[in-house]
Each structure stands twice: as structure tokens, then as C-alpha cells.
Amino acid sequence: MTNTPSSAPSPLTYRDAGVDIDAGNALVERIKPLVKRSFRPEVMGGLGGFGALFDLSNKYREPVLVSGTDGVGTKLKLAHQLNRHDTIGIDLVAMCVNDVLVQGAEPLFFLDYFATGKLDIDTAAAVVGGIANGCTEAGCALIGGETAEMPDMYAPGEYDLAGFTVAAVEKSELKDGASVAAGDVLIGIASSGPHSNGYSLVRRIYDRAGRPADLELEGGVKLVDALMAPTRLYVKPILSLLKSHGEAIHGMAHITGGGLTENIIRVVPDGLGLDIQASSWTLPPVFQWLQKEGAVADSEMWRTFNCGIGFVLIVAADQVAAVSDAVKAQGLEHWTIGQVVTAEGAERVHIG
């Protein structure tokens, strides 16, 4: 059937369908200076290529590549609710690079994925700016990424994030937990807050408490500031520690989903367990508030939140003092929180 002029459909564009290519290009131009600040000498070329290039040839003799990917969970929902978008990108970087750091690897480069229903340039620039700042702090290059505008896929004003990192470590210096032994000591390094885990429970408690945005915790910090504090980046101080005390550090753990109960044990060989003394550090005010308002059992706290311990070193017993002094010299608050013990059966972690 031939359409008559009166019935001919009006011409459509991609913008009519909800995708604004010009807005995407404008975002790229806006973030270029932020991204380039994160570049390392090994980065080849600039932004915009089909693939990002990184020259690994000069620094490593026997490099082992360590890759990681992660998101920030439902902390994003809280960011949307509070309209705070400038630090959530730091969370994204930290969740990825702190993970690969556990194996002694130096993060080399990072890529991000930002997806939204309708691109808001200001919001996206704030998020990517946070990612670039996180990469700069971690010493890795924000080498590429993807911004996807997908109409009808997300609620108005919302977006999703994912991050990807590649790190490298000399084969002879890889930390895999194989040397962890009974008697080794756990040094817990302070977190900056809940980091990016447990936020489905955080949001449920926050909602049930009436969303007290102006509430001040002990010490004068606002609750919302404590909840939105970006995940601490441990990369540079830990890499420095590995250079000076690598032989003494038998294993490491990033305390993420699963909390203290499930993360440290991941790098402990079979036949060994953990005895963690909860009294060795004070539960930070934000966790005290969450536990009280949510009537959360101790066991649930330990397996959901980091409870103030964001990263753990497993250290030879005769080297604890030296490593502890080195951690202090890096400006990191820390505590001796327990030790590795012999353990058989399913219950390998005791927190008391």
C-alpha cells in the first residue's frame, strides 16, 4: 500500500527515541581533562579509540595480570535519594582496586560503565569526576569507559555503574595466602565507614528510622555523611608496605560483602581458622547507630558490614611490631585484631 502525503509518518531521529548523541559527545569533552589527569606514562594514545592501549613492557620482569570487576551495590539508591553523585565514583574504583590489591598487585588501569535512561550531563560528569579522582588516588589510569543512554530501562534520574580494573604483580611476589600459618597475627586497618557493602540493610534501617538526614552521630558527624563517605583506597600505602615488609605479610583481605566473617577466611588455607577479638577495636558510631536502630544481632553485623575494619594484613608473629610501625607511618589507624589458629570443620571463624 502506498502512503498518501496526509498519512505519511513524521520522520524520527535517535533523539526522538530518547538517545541524545550530542549530549554524549558533550559529556566526553567535559570529562577529558579529568580523565587525562589520571593517565600514567604507559598509556598510549588518548580517549576515543575502539580499544585503550597500555604499554606494560618496561616495568615488570615476569608480570602476572590480575583483573577485577565490581559495582557499588544499592549505595547508588542512597546517592540518588540524597542527590550526592560526586564521590560514588570513588567507591566504584575502590571496590575494584582494593580487591586486586589483596594479591599484591598494582592497579594499572581502570574502565567504567555508566548506564542511564536519560543522560544528565551534570550528574554524569560528577560521577565520572569521582571515578577519575579515585583512579588518580590509586595511581591507575582511567583508560576508557562506556556511557549508555537506554530509554525505558531505568527510573527517571537513576543510573547504574560498573567498574573494571587490570593490575600486575611480579610472579615471585604474588600474595595468594599459601604461606599463612597458625600463629600469624591479624592487623586490621580502619575503614572510612560502611564502604559499599550492606546498603540494602542500611537503607531499610534508614527508612525505618524516618530518614533522619540531619541526625548527628557521636563525634558530630552527620549520619548521611557517614553513610555516604567514600570507600577508603588502600592501594598506595599497602603497596609501600609490601615493598618494605613484603616477606612478613603472608596474606591480605579486603573486607567487603560477607564482612569479617567471610572475607579473611578466603585467603586462609584449609585446616586453619581465625580467632578475632571484637574487643580489640571500638565499633564506629555509624555502625553503632545501624545496630541499635535495626536491632541487628552481632553475628549479622559481622557477616554484613566491615564494622570499622576495611582491610586486613595477615602477618608473621615475630614481625608484627615492625609491620605495625610501618602501617602507622603510612598514617593508617589500625589494631591487632586476632590470629590464625588450627581449625577443622565448618566453623573456622570465631569472633568474640
From Swiss-Prot:
It catalyses: 2-formamido-N(1)-(5-O-phospho-beta-D-ribosyl)acetamidine + ATP = 5-amino-1-(5-phospho-beta-D-ribosyl)imidazole + ADP + phosphate + H(+). Its EC number is 6.3.3.1. GO terms for cellular component: cytosol. Pathway: Purine metabolism; IMP biosynthesis via de novo pathway; 5-amino-1-(5-phospho-D-ribosyl)imidazole from N(2)-formyl-N(1)-(5-phospho-D-ribosyl)glycinamide: step 2/2. Gene3D superfamilies: PurM-like C-terminal domain, PurM-like, N-terminal domain. One of its GO terms (biological process) is adenine biosynthetic process. It comes from the Bacteria. It holds the Pfam family AIRS_C. The keyword Cell membrane does not apply. InterPro entries: PurM-like_C_dom, PurM-like_C_sf, PurM-like_N, PurM-like_N_sf, PurM_cligase. It is found in: Cytoplasm. CDD domains: PurM (cd02196). Keywords: ATP-binding, Cytoplasm, Ligase, Nucleotide-binding, Purine biosynthesis. Its main location: cytoplasm. GO terms for molecular function: ATP binding; phosphoribosylamine-glycine ligase activity; phosphoribosylformylglycinamidine cyclo-ligase activity. Belongs to the AIR synthase family. This is Phosphoribosylformylglycinamidine cyclo-ligase. It comes from Stenotrophomonas maltophilia (strain K279a).
